[in-house]
Regions:
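Inner-leaflet juxtamembrane helices
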Residues: 66-123
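Structural signature of transmembrane alpha-helix termini at the membrane-water interface
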Residues: 55-62, 81-91, 158-161
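Lipid-exposed faces of alpha-helical membrane segments in multi-pass integral membrane proteins
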Residues: 48, 52, 74-81, 148-158
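Membrane-interfacial loop-to-transmembrane-helix junctions in polytopic alpha-helical membrane proteins
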Residues: 35, 64-71, 134-144
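A hydrophobic membrane-anchoring alpha-helix module
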Residues: 123-161
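Cytosol/matrix-facing amphipathic helices and coiled-coil assembly/linker segments
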Residues: 2-62, 86
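Charge-rich, acidic-biased intrinsically disordered regions
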Residues: 46-68, 113-134
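Short membrane-interface loop/juxtamembrane segments of multi-pass integral membrane proteins
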Residues: 20-27, 103-139
Length: 161
């Protein structure tokens, strides 16, 4: 669908359009829902991965466990699968969140004005400590999670050696 078709289907250029306002509200709610689901999924995977780590290290710490190395291999493979699933889930969640944010960008002008497109920042940092440590920083929390999951995937791979 091109921009003109989109604008026509959602009556983007009509400030009084009920369809436009309803679409904007629904898209806004879906975006919030996607973000909520992202964190629920992340917490779910964190719990599974933490259990896998605990199981892995408790197996290795056991002195008299038969098939100790085989069991640790099985648990580390399970941990790898959960971690890789977390990575893919994070990427998929980010995809859908950005989809709804793009809809908001297209719909918002005649509903709220360019609210989602407008970025307000502090005029400056007070000192170097605030700039480097305590001040705000434009980073993606979901990308941090993705990098952490990649690191943990490599950790599971190392545990298998």
């Amino acid at each position: 669908m091109n921009q003109d078709e989109y604008n026509s289907k959602f009556e983007v250029n009509d400030k009084e359009s009920k369809l436009l306002k309803d679409a904007f509200n629904q898209v806004s709610d879906i975006r919030k829902f996607e973000i909520e689901l992202y964190w629920k999924r992340a917490a779910y995977f964190w719990a599974l991965i933490a259990v896998a780590f605990a199981g892995y290290f408790s197996i290795l710490a056991s002195e008299h466990m038969p098939s100790k190395f085989f069991l640790s291999l099985i648990v580390s493979c399970i941990g790898f699968v959960f971690t890789f699933a977390w990575f893919l889930s994070s990427r998929g969640s980010k995809y859908w969140q950005e989809n709804w944010e793009n809809h908001l960008d297209l719909l918002e002008n005649n509903v709220t004005g360019p609210l989602y497109k407008t970025l307000l920042e502090r005029p400056g940092h007070i000192n170097m400590a605030e700039k480097l440590i305590t001040g705000p920083l434009s980073v993606s929390v979901s990308k941090i999670n993705q990098w952490v999951s990649v690191f943990i995937v490599f950790a599971w791979c190392l545990f298998n050696n």
